[in-house]
Amino acid sequence: MSSLLDKTRMLNRILQKSGTEPVDFEDICDLLSDVLACNVYIISRKGKILGSKFYSGFECEEVREVVLKENRFPDFYNNKLLNVNETLSNSPNHDKCVFDNLKDCSINNKLSTIVPINGNRERLGTLLLARFDKEFTDEDLILAEYSATIIGLEILRSKQDQIEEEARKKAVVQLAIGTLSYSELEAVEHIFNELDGTEGLLVASKIADKVGITRSVIVNALRKFESAGVIESRSLGMKGTHIRILNDKLLEELKKIK
């Protein structure tokens, strides 16, 4: 039987293996499921399942259907989890389905342990463990809470990466817009008003006639955006030019100019 120290070292190896890359939540679920002999779910604050692992022989069809098909827990159940502010261990289901109290659970003596995932003074999600017949020990709970701390740090890092990526995309769009002349900017506004969503067909001559500018102004504006990686364009000959927006901040930044 592995000691608590051995199990903790296994978790540390996942961190060391990842280096600068994000930790794979599935790896944490696999390890916890193996060493704790239980089902493991990592759930975001909004109920999305970030990682999960069913322990061999401990499969609940109701939960499996939710995990595999929906990839999220029902809102009412997720709200119950969020109301747990500190580790709740060995909570019995009283032989009732956790998703429907009117239905009997197909497996008797199910015990759940709920570990809040917190970081930066906010609730980030929940680590949910489920086992049958055998209670979680203090050692199990120490490992679960340590895992929740690791997961919390990874969620925070992921959120920070997302914020930085959003800022980078905005900066790229702003730089691309800054290279346009007044007439090119006017052309760009009309071009993207003509598009249906994030991609569509553009006939430069029609827009040139409509706005009262030369076709070359439109072509130059599109080239500048394409070289900045903001859009992708493909000539279809007489039919026109197919344009696809690659940077989802483009339309948002153009609206600000208006």
Curated annotation (Swiss-Prot):
* Matches recorded under InterPro entries: CodY (IPR014154), GAF-like_dom_sf (IPR029016), GTP_trans_reg_CodY_C (IPR013198), Transc_reg_CodY_N (IPR010312), WH-like_DNA-bd_sf (IPR036388), WH_DNA-bd_sf (IPR036390)
Keywords from UniProt, A to Z, are:
Cytoplasm, DNA-binding, Repressor, Transcription, Transcription regulation
Instruction: Spell out the subcellular localization from the entry.
Output: Cytoplasm
Keyword Metal-binding on entry: no
Query: Which Pfam families would you find in this protein's record?
Result: CodY, HTH_CodY
Q: Where is this region: GAF domain?
A: 1-156
Q: Where does this protein bind DNA?
A: 204-223
Naming one, the record's GO cellular component terms include: cytoplasm
* Cystines in this chain: none
Query: Which superkingdom?
Result: Bacteria
- Give the UniProt record's GO annotations in the biological process aspect: negative regulation of DNA-templated transcription
For this UniProt entry, the molecular function terms from Gene Ontology, in alphabetical order, are: DNA binding; DNA-binding transcription factor activity; GTP binding
Q: Which HAMAP family match?
A: HTH_type_CodY
What this protein is reported to do is described as: DNA-binding global transcriptional regulator which is involved in the adaptive response to starvation and acts by directly or indirectly controlling the expression of numerous genes in response to nutrient availability. During rapid exponential growth, CodY is highly active and represses genes whose products allow adaptation to nutrient depletion.
> Which PANTHER family does the UniProt record give?
GLOBAL TRANSCRIPTIONAL REGULATOR CODY, GTP-SENSING TRANSCRIPTIONAL PLEIOTROPIC REPRESSOR CODY
Family, similarity comment: Belongs to the CodY family.
User: What is the name attached to this protein's record?
Assistant: Global transcriptional regulator CodY
Q: What is the lineage of its organism?
A: Bacteria, Bacillati, Bacillota, Clostridia, Eubacteriales
By which gene is this protein encoded? codY
